[in-house]
Curated annotation (Swiss-Prot):
Keywords: Endoplasmic reticulum, Meiosis. One of its GO terms (cellular component) is perinuclear endoplasmic reticulum membrane. Its main location: endoplasmic reticulum. It comes from Schizosaccharomyces pombe (strain 972 / ATCC 24843) (Fission yeast). One of its GO terms (biological process) is nucleocytoplasmic transport. The keyword Transit peptide does not apply. Residues 16-68, 189-229 are annotated as: Disordered. This is Meiotically up-regulated gene 31 protein. The keyword Cytoplasm does not apply. Has a role in meiosis. The gene is mug31.
Amino acid sequence: MASTFSQSVFARSLYEDSAENKVDSSKNTEANFPITLPKVLPTDPKASSLHKPQEQQPNIIPSKEEDKKPVINSMKLPSIPAPGTDNINESHIPRGYWKHPAVDKIAKRLHDQAPSDRTWSRMVSNLFAFISIQFLNRYLPNTTAVKVVSWILQALLLFNLLESVWQFVRPQPTFDDLQLTPLQRKLMGLPEGGSTSGKHLTPPRYRPNFSPSRKAENVKSPVRSTTWA
């Protein structure tokens, strides 16, 4: 009886309807309740590090002074004073003034050659005296003694007058006799040129006469040798 019922057309239709209902119910459940499976992460450590969230670091903007000066830990690098600075005192620093030996010579020559107020007065007085003697010769007796004295006075006055005029006419000195370098002449305001040699104005006090070609045994000792009898 059971076998005939299961093999009947009605039983088969019921079985097929139940199977279709099960398939439809499974589709409805999947549509209503979707199931998301977890994605498999890659096994590469580099790729896994990319998926990790990066920690936010504080944005520190250094100042201009910090950029120029390196950060040095004072505990690791203690400050060391310069050698000998503690013993130096400003009061013991030698201070002085040095002047080139040729400065005095240059100043004296320029003073003697430059015309001054005395030169003007000397020139005017000699000129006035020379004109006065020429005027007095007309009233003096025409004797030999008077003529000789007049000529001597006129010669002296004329010499003084020409010497005064020469100070205004003569060229400027070049100081070629002084041993100066071109830089020294420029600093002193002298004209360029002139003979310069390698000699010193003040030669050194000691000049060693030792030649490196000599041997040690051939060099004589400065101490006087003594002989014993």
